[in-house]
């Protein structure tokens, strides 16, 4: 048993809870495992006893029927009903804890998460005249307080799951749902789409960072200030407007540089702060110098089937210039 459980460690393990919902699920898991083992042991003991007993007692037909009825009622009805009701009563508070119920004081932070094939869009709605903060494949949340995640899918069914904080919840196209999670303390947690959504399902990772409230507010304020476009990247910005701006957005990017002849359907990730993200392609490449240029040149090899078309018509030098500029987009 210990050998098997040793494979349950890691950042995607629910056996290392870091929040109230995950802690409740942790205990439900252990209780369910314990009850299952006890029932399995009883069944195996009775099964072995049936084969190993040396003498079979002689009974009348009526006695045999009474014994059979006891086993059917006891083992087939009473025991399952008692176990299931007990587990439901024990587990009910866990599900209730993840519902967006009114809090005793204040309002929870709200974050929107949209699942795409195969990446995550994360939105922080602004209040009043504040602009929304939009990022991708990285989720920053305040620690020590409940957060309501409004989740939806843009294409197929996905599932939002942060094992160490709780979950999971299906993301259904056209239907929004809400799940409430909380991180006990600051930390970095792994998240993964938990519903098969196509060829690159396994390459749909989300890095979750829980930070103190002050750091969270500062992070949002930095993202709401559009990045300053440096003159040293003029050629890269012109190339981005020509080839990339039909699908991707950078806050503050001048409309005059966007190729008006192209169909504009923003279907790719917002790239406003891409240089500060921990990885590319939802976990395919670590973010390091030259990584974006390499991704632009080889993305269909690194993540086959992703919706960004090949860039065979763009020379390598131009792709490297675009990559260098995008890496510089950091608050």
What are these regions (language model features)?
Residues 9-28, 51-266, 283-297, 302-304, ...:
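Non-transmembrane, membrane-proximal soluble domains of secreted or membrane proteins
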Residues 1-10:
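N-terminal secretory/membrane targeting signals
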Residues 21-42:
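Membrane-entry segments of alpha-helical transmembrane domains in multi-pass membrane proteins
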Residues 8, 330-331:
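Short, solvent-exposed mixed-charge patches
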Residues 40-56:
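Alpha-helical transmembrane segments
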Residues 38-45, 78, 82:
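Residues within alpha-helical transmembrane segments of multi-pass membrane proteins, especially transporters
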Residues 324-329:
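Aromatic- and Gly/Pro-enriched helix-to-coil junctions and flexible linker segments
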């Amino acid at each position: 048993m210990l050998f098997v459980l040793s494979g349950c460690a890691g950042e995607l393990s629910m056996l290392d809870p870091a929040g109230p919902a995950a802690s409740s699920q942790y205990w439900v898991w252990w209780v369910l495992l314990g009850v299952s083992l006890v029932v399995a042991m009883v069944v195996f003991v009775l099964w072995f006893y049936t084969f190993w007993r040396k003498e079979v007692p002689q009974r009348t037909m009526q006695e045999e029927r009474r014994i059979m009825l006891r086993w059917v009622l006891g083992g087939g009805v009473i025991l399952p009903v008692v176990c299931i009701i007990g587990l439901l009563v024990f587990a009910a508070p866990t599900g209730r804890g993840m519902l967006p119920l009114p809090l005793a004081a204040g309002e929870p932070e709200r974050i929107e998460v949209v699942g795409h094939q195969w990446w995550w869009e994360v939105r922080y709605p602004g209040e009043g005249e504040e602009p929304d903060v939009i990022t991708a494949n990285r989720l920053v949340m305040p620690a020590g307080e409940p957060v309501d995640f409004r989740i939806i899918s843009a294409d197929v069914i996905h599932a939002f799951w942060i094992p160490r904080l709780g979950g999971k919840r299906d993301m259904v196209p056209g239907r929004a749902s809400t799940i409430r999670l909380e991180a006990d303390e600051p930390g970095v947690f792994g998240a993964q789409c938990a519903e098969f959504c196509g060829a690159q399902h396994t390459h749909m990772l989300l890095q979750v960072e829980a930070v103190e409230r002050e750091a969270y507010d500062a992070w949002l304020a930095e993202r709401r200030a559009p990045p300053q476009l440096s003159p040293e990247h003029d050629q890269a910005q012109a190339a981005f407007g020509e080839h990339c701006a039909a699908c991707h957005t950078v806050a503050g990017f001048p409309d005059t540089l966007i190729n008006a002849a192209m169909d504009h359907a923003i279907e790719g990730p917002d790239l406003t702060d891409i240089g500060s993200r921990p990885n590319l392609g939802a976990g395919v490449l670590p973010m390091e110098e030259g990584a974006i240029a390499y991704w632009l040149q080889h993305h269909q090899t690194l993540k086959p089937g992703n919706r960004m078309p090949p860039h065979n018509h763009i020379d390598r030098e131009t792709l490297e210039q675009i990559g260098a500029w995008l890496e510089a987009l950091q608050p």
